[in-house]
Amino acid sequence: MFNAEIKERFVKSYSSKISVRTSCKQFFDISQKYEEQWGADLYTRTAEELSQFLAEASGLTTQSRNFTLSILKSYIKWCMTQSDISGVCEDALQISATYSEKFKTQTVTSPIHLQRYLDSVFAPEDDQTIENLYRTYFWMAYAGLNQNDVFKIKNKDVDFSDMVIRYNEKVYPIYREGAKAIKYCVELDYIRSERTNTGKFITIDRIDSDFIMRGRKSVLTLKSMKERTSKKLKEALDKGKTDLRLSYFKVWISGLFYRMFMDELSGIKPDFLPFVKDIDSTKGTKNRLNDLKNRAKYYYEDYQCWKDSLNK
């Protein structure tokens, strides 16, 4: 950490919770790169100078941004009270946590946009490689499935006549753009693999299983899927094939906002409370209901940022 002694003093005074202290230290680890470039501590910078740093240090959601912003402002205010610290820039307290630009580079706007992204990262569907499983993983994210549930979906859960996936008494859409990849995952009992030395494809049998995410030797796990897709996504970004920085969660929230947007275009007022109630398994109490309302409010604020990014 830059100015480690000062920051460690702040962290100790900020919270006694280990989780919060850990988050603070992670925040300052990210700030170190900027502080070394400036040759100065965060507390000396203006709101404008801190904007780019804050965009990197915080996550995508309103809750994450607000938490990160709270640490930053608390640190600056704390520095103002310390007699051995000078040069604190009070203008930094005017910094805002709202920036739709991040949504432009970390979400997709529509199924067409997602398909374009997947095309830039993975092999074409008709090559019939294992990368159709990777595509399907992200299409299930876009449809709204919980990340762990993806690996529990069976062939019988997929209905191409109604273009839906039925699982655990819920219905998830199959988007036209993703149907081919999903169909190959359901129907093919083999995958093709390209030999790098010859450029020719060989056919490999998939394991006998009812699960969609079946590979050559086993059904893929969340751990192996995250490792494989993270590598492919980073490679595409590094090679300039895309400027998007996506993950399962970012694709998932993109799908949530897209469906809400389609409802809004049909005249339905955006309301995330039914959604947060549906995904929350806790029995209702007054305090719990207030918490759900707050979560719905955060989703709505993020949704507005996502909509703003559509016009940029």
Task: Label each region the model flagged.
Residues 116-147:
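Basic, Lys/Arg- and aromatic-enriched nucleic-acid-binding interface segment
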Residues 100-117, 170-181:
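DNA breakage-rejoining catalytic core of tyrosine-based enzymes
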Residues 182-243:
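Active-site/catalytic core of tyrosine-dependent DNA strand-transfer enzymes
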Residues 58-59, 120-128, 154-163:
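Solenoid-like repeat scaffolds
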Residues 34, 230-312:
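Short, basic (Lys/Arg/His-rich) helix/loop patches that form interaction surfaces
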Residues 152-184:
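Conserved tyrosine-mediated DNA breakage-rejoining catalytic core shared by Y-recombinases
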Residues 137, 148-153, 256:
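Alpha-helix N-cap/helix-start motif at helix boundaries, enriched for small hydrophobics
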Residues 4-103:
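N-terminal core-binding DNA-recognition domain of tyrosine recombinases/integrases
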